[in-house]
Structures are given as C-alpha cells and as structure tokens.
Amino acid sequence: MPKMKTNSAASKRAKITGTGKVKHVGSAMRHNLEHKSARKRRELSADDVLRGGQAKKLHQLLQK
C-alpha cells in the first residue's frame, strides 16, 4: 500500500514541536495594526498552541 501524503495546506500553517504539541501562527496580525496597542501586538505576535480536537485533527493531517 502506498504512503499517505501529508496535507500540504496544514503543513504550511502548523508545526509539531519536539514534545508533540501543535503550534501555529495566530490571526489579527496582517493589517490594521495602527490602532492596536504595543502590548496587544506583542501578545498577538506569539505563536499559539492548539489543544483538544483541533490538535488531534492536525496530527492526523500531518501524520505524525
């Protein structure tokens, strides 16, 4: 049976850390940043860690 392909869209958007957590870049940092405070921009710039069902689904898509 052939190998399963990794989902390309998921692999571009998420990464599995060494401990097995799923990390992805959050939203709200593309434009309209001038009205957000420096504190808010700093908080939003950090990568998010997915939990629960979303993490489980991405593990299946990335096959790890």
From Swiss-Prot:
Bias (Basic residues): 54-64
Tagged with keyword Ubl conjugation: no
Ranges of biased composition (kind: Polar residues): 1-10
GO CC list: ribonucleoprotein complex; ribosome
A single BP term in Gene Ontology: translation
UniProt entry keywords in alphabetical sequence: Ribonucleoprotein, Ribosomal protein
Disordered as annotated region, ranges: 1-64
Family matches, as InterPro entries: Ribosomal_bL35, Ribosomal_bL35-like, Ribosomal_bL35_sf
GO MF annotations in UniProt: structural constituent of ribosome
Cross-referenced HAMAP family: Ribosomal_bL35 (MF_00514)
Family under the similarity heading: Belongs to the bacterial ribosomal protein bL35 family.
Entry protein name: Large ribosomal subunit protein bL35
